[in-house]
Design a protein with these regions (language model features):
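Aromatic-lined carbohydrate-recognition surfaces of secreted/lumenal glycan-active proteins
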Residues: 8-21, 43-44, 51
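Histidine-acidic metal/acid-base catalytic patches
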Residues: 23-27, 31-44, 50-136
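Anion (oxyanion) recognition and catalysis
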Residues: 4
């Protein structure tokens, strides 16, 4: 109610199914929570979907029209709870499929490059991720 009255766009960010209390890792749950809220959107994290074994294209389609910003990752494996980030286009996630679906939806929000690896010097890999987004 507060967001609607004050023109504030709020977004729910999902996390993987780390514990039984967290069911908002599932995009269907988030969609159900926000469907009637005018100013409440989703901030989906495709890396957490991957860790939970949820296909990101399915997630984006489920949340269509209610996505404010995207936390975008590529990961070494799909469905591995202890997954590792890799530069975009070099991992197991369907990066082109995700981008194509977001384009199809007319998504005009922000892509947040979320690279959680190479903690001592992540910049070269983050630049690769940025270049991948520019090309695709």
């Amino acid at each position: 109610k507060y967001c609607g009255e004050n023109g504030i766009k709020m977004a729910i960010h999902n996390h993987a199914a780390d514990n039984k209390a967290n069911n908002y890792y599932d995009p269907r749950v988030v969609k159900n929570l926000i469907k009637d809220c005018k100013n409440v959107y989703a901030c989906p994290d495709n890396g957490h979907w991957s860790r939970a074994g949820i296909d990101s294209v399915f997630g984006y389609k489920t949340l269509e029209g209610k996505i404010a910003i995207v936390h975008f990752k590529d990961q070494k494996e799909f469905g591995n709870h202890k997954n590792q980030c890799v530069p975009f286009g070099t991992g197991a996630l369907d990066m082109k499929g995700m981008l194509a679906d977001l384009d199809r939806q007319g998504f005009d929000g922000y892509y947040l490059i979320e690279y959680e690896a190479e903690w001592d010097n992540p910049l070269p890999s983050v630049v690769k991720c940025y270049e991948y987004l520019k090309k695709n």
